[in-house]
């Protein structure tokens, strides 16, 4: 199981991923709101099976 936290921003977002034992799989990494940004995100997350996402959307968007 992998756990990913995404901080949603107006122009770019940040993602960090940890494993079940708390091991850091991806330190805070930015990704954009375009196709290449989401391709980058999917590369960082790996396969969708076994990945739990949490979003922090504190802005008005």
What are the language-model segments listed below?
Residues 1-61:
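Phosphate- and other anionic-substrate recognition elements at nucleic-acid/protein interfaces
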């Amino acid at each position: 199981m992998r756990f990913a936290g995404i901080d949603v921003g107006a122009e770019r977002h940040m993602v960090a991923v940890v494993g079940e034992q708390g091991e850091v799989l991806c330190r805070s990494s930015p990704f954009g709101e375009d196709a290449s940004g989401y391709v980058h995100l999917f590369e960082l997350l790996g396969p969708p099976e076994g990945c739990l996402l949490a979003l922090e959307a504190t802005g008005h968007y």
